[in-house]
UniProtKB/Swiss-Prot annotation:
One of its GO terms (biological process) is thymus development. This is Dual specificity mitogen-activated protein kinase kinase 1. Its main location: cytoplasm. Pfam families: Pkinase. The gene is Map2k1. The active site is at 190 (proton acceptor). It catalyses: L-seryl-[protein] + ATP = O-phospho-L-seryl-[protein] + ADP + H(+); L-threonyl-[protein] + ATP = O-phospho-L-threonyl-[protein] + ADP + H(+); L-tyrosyl-[protein] + ATP = O-phospho-L-tyrosyl-[protein] + ADP + H(+).
Length: 393
């Protein structure tokens, strides 16, 4: 079907001509922004939503600590805490991430400067950015509030996420990664369920990508975790590229489909407990690892084996076969899609262009799925008065 010529995006400058977070000449900025947005292939609904977000954003002005009122905590991780806040001057509800860093003023200023690139990241698949500032030893990053939270939170409520839903997630992640790469020459560097956000309108967006090299370096010492989504080449310290993000997406999809972090892979007994039936396939053939004396049983999922120490886990990712989806419960297309994401050699791993034309993505794109309805019933959210079908995302 031929694509309709997109309607020009309508952005009206803020009436008082005020600067958007320190940027001046609003008129010129808006013209440039309008041009950039018209290059994106947006449908009518996406266009209207981006327009509405950017028009709201113009009312925000300079962000200051005193202008925020805390509503609730949304989550913690990645070196920071995220709060749902009200921005009193504009009345907007935002997500505010606070990152505490002991750093020199010059480094701090560089981080704030580097984060300004986020003002340029306008896509239906990327969380909207209001601005960043420093106050009282903390860097604040203010973003669009996504009322469905992150997919790791959704997974906890859902137990497992259905394949049809993960099809829509895959499309959004691929389009988000493609946008970052093609329009901004940046890779995400941290694709995982907690960095994929969703909302009651059925939107799926990436957040927390590596736009500030200085912030990545400053936070490098704060890595604490029991799971890793990093690719084998990245863990080995060799050169890595956007192919590394594709591995992370594949690993995240297996986790969300099966209902637990997939390393070490579940054995036949655990798969039977997870899916309520006997499951065929390689994922079920892994012999149980010997249990270290005195190590506690894992409370994660239904695995009776001890939790891996982080060095064991990283060694497993680098040296053992990659995770797979068990056969018999998922379509062959989905299994093949995941396998192509989880090839250990990055040169052989599928790239974004190949994944976009994969049979699983083509099928998922054509499917009518009420993503918003599924999300709202799963996590107990009220659906907006005009529900969104993810097919139109």
């Amino acid at each position: 079907m031929p694509k309709k010529k997109p309607t020009p995006i309508q952005l009206n400058p803020a009436p008082d001509g005020s600067a958007v977070n320190g940027t001046s000449s609003a008129e010129t900025n808006l013209e440039a922004l309008q041009k950039k947005l018209e290059e994106l292939e947006l449908d009518e609904q996406q266009r209207k939503r981006l327009e509405a977000f950017l028009t709201q954003k113009q009312k925000v002005g300079e962000l200051k600590d005193d202008d925020f009122e805390k509503i609730s905590e949304l989550g913690a991780g990645n070196g920071g805490v995220v709060f749902k806040v009200s921005h009193k001057p504009s009345g907007l509800v935002m997500a505010r991430k606070l990152i505490h860093l002991e750093i020199k003023p010059a480094i701090r200023n560089q981080i704030i400067r580097e984060l300004q690139v986020l003002h340029e990241c306008n896509s239906p698949y990327i969380v909207g950015f209001y601005g960043a500032f420093y106050s009282d030893g903390e860097i604040s990053i203010c973003m669009e509030h996504m009322d469905g939270g992150s997919l790791d939170q959704v997974l906890k409520k859902a137990g497992r996420i259905p394949e049809q839903i993960l099809g829509k997630v895959s499309i959004a992640v691929i389009k988000g990664l493609t946008y970052l790469r093609e329009k901004h020459k940046i890779m995400h560097r941290d694709v995982k369920p907690s960095n994929i956000l969703v909302n009651s309108r059925g939107e799926i967006k990436l957040c927390d990508f590596g736009v500030s090299g200085q912030l990545i370096d400053s936070m490098a010492n704060s890595f604490v975790g029991t799971r890793s989504y990093m690719s084998p080449e990245r863990l080995q310290g060799t050169h890595y590229s956007v192919q590394s993000d594709i591995w992370s997406m594949g690993l995240s999809l297996v986790e969300m489909a099966v209902g637990r972090y997939p390393i070490p892979p579940p054995d036949a007994k655990e798969l039977e407990l997870l899916f309520g039936c006997q499951v065929e396939g390689d994922a079920a053939e892994t012999p149980p690892r010997p249990r270290t004396p005195g190590r506690p049983l894992s409370s994660y999922g239904m695995d009776s084996r001890p939790p891996m120490a982080i060095f064991e886990l990283l060694d497993y990712i680098v040296n053992e076969p990659p995770p797979k989806l068990p056969s018999g419960v998922f379509s062959l297309e989905f299994q093949d899609f995941v396998n192509k994401c989880l090839i250990k050699n990055p040169a052989e791993r599928a790239d974004l262009k190949q994944l976009m034309v994969h049979a699983f993505i083509k099928r998922s794109d054509a499917e009518e799925v009420d993503f918003a309805g599924w999300l709202c019933s799963t996590i107990g959210l009220n659906q907006p008065s005009t529900p969104t079908h993810a097919a139109s995302i």
